Structure formats: C-alpha cells, structure tokens
Amino acid sequence: MSLLALFFAITLGLAAADPPKDRLTYSIEWRLIHAGEAVLEYGPSSASVKLESAGLVSTLYKVQDAYRVEFDAPFCATSSMMNSSEGSRRRETAVTFDRNRGRASLTEKDLIKNSVVSKTEAQIPNCVQEVAAALLRLRRTKVEVGQSTQIPMSDGRKFAQVKVDAQERERIKTPAGTFNTVRYEANLLNGVIYSRKGRAFIWLTDDERRVPVRILLRMNFPLGTVTLDLEKEEHP
C-alpha cells in the first residue's frame, strides 16, 4: 500500500458515538518544498482520503490516490478501497473485513494489465481498525501524556497490536493557525504493520475537539521526512 495509508494509520481507544462530519485539508511538505495536498473527510459510517502531488514533485513523480473505508460502530472496519495512480503504476486494492469469520481478505489489481497482483488473508479479532477510521478513534479518546495503549490494527495483509504513545504537549504553527497540542507516536512501522523503516507522529489539539493539525513521517533515506500540516477545516 502507498504512503497514503501511513499518513492515517494511527488509532486507539474505544468510542461508540457517531464521528464528526469534517473535511480537513492538509498541505504536504517534503524536503522543504510543497509536495501536494491531502483531503480527509468523515461521515457517520465512512471516511475518505484524497491525495494529490503538486509542483516539482508532481513533475518528477505524479501521485493521485483515493481511499475510502466503511465501518460499523465503534469504528470497526467492514471494507476499504484504494485507487492509486503513482508514476506509471495504476493499482486498485480492496479489503474486506469479515467480523464473523475473523478474517481480512485483500485483493490488489494492476489496472493497466487488468490482472490480479496479489491476494492475501489475515486473521483478525472481531473489531479491527484500518487506516482512515483510525484517526476518528484517536480524536474521541484521551490518553494522558506519558501513557500508552495497544490497539488491534490490520491493513488486510497483517494484523498486529499497535502501541501508541502520548509523548508530550507542544505549541505548533500550521497554515491554519497556532495550536496547543499533544504529540503522539504510533509504532506501526519497522515491520509491525508496514515494512518501511521510520517513525510516525501525529499532533492533536489539546482541547475537546482534538483536531489532527499535523502528521509527520520520519523515514529512512531516500524518502526522508514528510509533513502534513492542517491548512483548512470545514464542516459541510
């Protein structure tokens, strides 16, 4: 799965209430240049992410990704679909989370060759989190600074209990303003869920709204650091 999945693969806690209806727009920075834009939208039983590269990055390696997940309360994934256009690659990745069987089934297709690239299954618990609904649960659950939790997570290929740490309070600035936040680290890289080496962080506002205002991936060479900063928040 592409880097789009990593940006939103952070989750913890329990919450049964309907998620907020939000549209959050992020500016993406890579190696100190504007690399693109990501839009995250939430509904009562679904979430979607759209990512598009821009500027020099788009000239070198154009990216247009769209991801959607359906879920039951409390944010238990039922299905997801990723359509990715990255460089010369065109892929469609569908995952079904069967809560009765306790299995996640993934099918990845090459849309150019019209062929199946891979099919995998993973054993999962009755309620598991994936990549976009994950952020909803983080927003609805407060883990105090210095505390951590372990949560069940699957991308359709693997299942793991992912540890999430509430590290410290920070005041940060993004294009949307200046915010008092709590920084979290999700330990889902380095073979836990994703094989890439690195670290994943997220900053939520330190208030009842708990808006995700920054997401940062600190990866090994050659990718380096990718930062998503909140640019705009809407409630359509």
Give short role names for the model-derived ranges:
Residues 2-13:
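Bacterial N-terminal signal peptides
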Residues 17-101, 138-236:
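Acidic, serine/threonine-rich low-complexity disordered tracts
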Residues 93-140:
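Hydrophobic, well-structured mid-protein blocks that either form specific transmembrane helices
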